[in-house]
Swiss-Prot record:
Active site: 203, 323
InterPro entries in the cross-refs: CBD2 (IPR001919), CBM2/CBM3_carb-bd_dom_sf (IPR008965), CBM2_carb-bd_dom_sf (IPR012291), Glyco_hydro_5 (IPR001547), Glyco_hydro_5_CS (IPR018087), Glycoside_hydrolase_SF (IPR017853)
Temperature dependency: Optimum temperature is 81 degrees Celsius. Thermostable.
Protein name: Endoglucanase E1
Enzyme class: hydrolase
GO BP terms, alphabetized: cellulose catabolic process
Residues making up the signal peptide according to the UniProt record: 1-41
Length: 562
């Protein structure tokens, strides 16, 4: 019994006072229960793991529910779509749809000094990106993402912009370069928890192995070397390690086979930093045999359990489905996605005690999956986005002023000899090849910016220019080009014009950083009001997107300046 309610002989006043005090205390307690206290928002600070969960700095469980926005890994050296939209509006839309994390693919090319993006429209958009290197553009994206409560996972997607590689090194990009570039980025964003971690290498596949012990092809050992190198720079980062293609003769999607991780786990020097990552796709990427199994889709949970789900189910480590996607055109793909979403565990039922995920992709220009955005880079595919609604999660707290990079990264290490897999390790072709989505561009019809009035160029004394024409991407019926205009004279230009004649039926559908007009096969590109002045020896670039059939030979370009 509470002290105030005990009977004190001859003290009825004390009893009444005690009763009043007790009643008031009870009312206050009930009032506190009646008014819900605001829940602590998840995602603050750097993250760590505990069993199969990811926790924030306050030990609040978080769920990565995100999207892939690619482009830094291509020869555009920047996220795609900035030829149509401002990067901030893109990030705002990602947040508005309920995605809280962006997997940001890149290649080691962007760490080479002076690498510049070549497909950004600066006309009434992206003006604060003008003149920035690719890395500096990445800084801007990371900073704004953090300000609005998004998080970033940096994904070493390719060694260079020419394409994916089975192993983490190639003849031109060594393991030493791979590791030093990871460390440089870790140093660059050190102190900024917007960048929560690194996906060390995208989709290792044959001849990459798991647990075979050969340092030239054992991806598990390479992941330990790279992961520990990153953690030596910033021990607070998460290390995301994908699987391989084959284990004990059992083939799966590239990067999706984690069957060996139970027996041969990745061991890092810093505990509670490891997240395993898998990729999974539907028939629009490749018609794997399990899609035609008569028990489909009931067979799929067992396949997922075997290859990567067991790591979560057995509380070994968190599992992040870093890529999964589909055009959603076939009923099989629709059934696959619905089944997979349930397997990943709906947030309303399981909260953050669930699989982590980032959908492939935000971009519409992924040829075998399409994207959440449609080809105009504005309209949302609400059907596809709707399939993901049950597994979306909350947006995180904004990151403060720490969004600036801590330092410039050191230049990439010059390639040094890397271990080469022996001929005996070359895999035997399997009856069912495993495809990986290679982004291909789809023409995007957006208005061409209007140029400010400029006089027709005349050959003024000392005003000269040259132009170079470079095809960035060609997917068989369309392509993108960057044209570099260089001042080859002795005085600054006031205006410039580049012209050429196509040899086929190429038709320009979109352009940026120049006023481009086409009359039949003849094309003229004139400067905008903001890039007319080029100092001697300096250059500016513009670009365009076009469609074609037949051949697509590069034309000869001419440049005139005044």
């Amino acid at each position: 019994m509470p002290r105030a309610l005990r009977r004190v002989p001859g003290s009825r006043v004390m009893l009444r006072v005690g009763v009043v005090v007790a009643v008031l205390a009870l009312v206050a307690a009930l009032a506190n229960l009646a008014v819900p206290r605001p829940a602590r928002a998840a995602g603050g600070g750097y993250w760590h793991t505990s069993g199969r969960e990811i926790l924030d700095a306050n030990n609040v469980p978080v769920r990565i529910a995100g999207i892939n926005w690619f482009g830094f890994e291509t020869c555009n050296y920047v996220v795609h779509g900035l030829w149509s939209r401002d990067y901030r509006s893109m990030l705002d839309q990602i947040k508005s749809l309920g995605y809280n994390t962006i997997r940001l693919p890149y290649s080691d090319d962007i760490l080479k000094p002076g690498t510049m993006p070549n497909s950004i429209n600066f006309y009434q958009m992206n003006q604060d990106l003008q003149g920035l290197t690719s890395l500096q553009v990445m800084d801007k994206i990371v900073a704004y993402a953090g300000q609005i409560g998004l998080r970033i996972i940096l994904d070493r997607h390719r060694p260079d912009c020419s394409g994916q590689s089975a192993l983490w090194y190639t003849s031109s990009v060594s393991e030493a370069t791979w590791i030093s570039d990871l460390q440089a980025l870790a140093q660059r964003y050190k102190g900024n928890p917007t960048v929560v971690g690194f996906d060390l290498h995208n989709e290792p596949h044959d001849p990459a192995c798991w647990g075979c012990g050969d340092p030239s092809i054992d991806w598990r050992l390479a992941a330990e070397r790279a992961g520990n190198a990153v953690l030596s720079v910033n021990p607070n980062l998460l290390i995301f390690v994908e699987g391989v293609q084959s284990y004990n003769g059992d083939s799966y999607w590239w990067g999706g086979n984690l069957q060996g991780a139970g027996q041969y786990p990745v061991v890092l020097n810093v505990p509670n930093r490891l997240v395993y990552s898998a990729h999974d796709y539907a028939t629009s990427v490749y018609p794997q045999t399990w899609f035609s199994d008569p028990t489909f889709p009931n067979n799929m949970p067992g396949i997922w359990n075997k290859n990567w789900g067991y790591l979560f189910n057995q509380n070994i480590a968190p599992v992040w489905l870093g890529e999964f996607g589909t055009t959603l055109q076939s009923t099989t793909d629709q059934t696959w996605l619905k089944t997979l979403v349930q397997y990943l565990r709906p947030t309303a039922q399981y909260g953050a005690d669930s699989f982590q995920w980032t959908f492939w992709s935000w971009n519409p220009d992924s040829g075998d999956t399409g994207g959440i955005l449609k080809d105009d880079w504005q309209t949302v595919d609400t059907v596809k986005d709707g399939y993901l609604a049950p597994i979306k999660s909350s947006i995180f707290d904004p990151v403060g002023a720490s969004a600036s990079p801590s330092s410039q990264p050191s230049p990439s290490v010059s390639p040094s000899p890397s271990p080469s897999p022996s001929a005996s390790r070359t895999p035997t072709p399997t009856p069912t090849p495993t495809a990986s989505p290679t982004p291909t561009l789809t023409p995007t019809a957006t208005p061409t910016p209007t140029a400010s009035p400029t006089p027709s160029p005349t050959a003024a004394s000392g005003a000269r220019c040259t132009a170079s024409y470079q095809v960035n991407s060609d997917w068989g019926n369309g392509f993108t080009v960057t044209v570099a205009v260089t001042n080859s004279g002795s005085v600054a230009t006031k205006t410039w014009t580049v012209s050429w004649t196509f040899g086929g039926n190429q038709t320009i559908t979109n352009s940026w950083n120049a006023a481009v007009t086409q009359n039949g096969q003849s094309v003229t590109a004139r400067n905008m009001s903001y890039n007319n002045v080029i100092q001697p020896g300096q250059n500016t670039t513009f670009g365009f997107q076009a469609s074609y059939t037949g051949s697509n030979a590069a034309p000869t370009v001419a440049c005139a300046a005044s």
